[in-house]
A protein has these predicted regions:
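C-terminal structural segments of small proteins and small subunits
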Residues: 80-84
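Short S/T/G/P-rich N-terminal loop/turn motif that feeds into the first structured element of a domain
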Residues: 1-77, 87-108
Length: 108
């Protein structure tokens, strides 16, 4: 089963909004996407990349084709399109062919 890892940066001045979104709206969106598309949140992590601190969100995808299905849905189009574009850019996304071991736990 593939895993999508998407990197993003939170610009200064937007941190309070980002924290609000991640604590209140993000869990609801993840549940909706999980029910509708079968994707599962693995986790959201802060990572150091060079001199910057970035964030990475990892999703367990039922198949690579699910990005095409999500891209056709206008409500989630931007997220799916970004994920589809980043498939070939290692800096932004990586897809793993197998699931990680049982030691990886999902926290919502």
């Amino acid at each position: 089963m593939p895993v999508l890892a998407t990197y993003f940066n939170v610009r200064r001045g937007r941190d309070p909004f980002f924290k609000f979104y991640m604590k209140t709206l993000f869990p609801r969106h993840v549940r909706e996407y999980s029910e509708k598309y079968g994707i599962k949140l693995i986790g959201w992590f802060n990572v150091a990349h060079g001199w910057d601190f970035d964030n990475v969100i990892m999703f367990d995808l039922p198949s690579y084709g699910i990005l095409d299905v999500m891209e056709r849905d206008e409500g989630i189009q931007a997220i799916a399109h970004r994920g589809s574009e980043w498939i070939m850019e290692r800096h932004h996304s990586m897809f793993l062919r197998e699931r990680m071991g049982p030691e990886l736990k999902i926290h919502l």
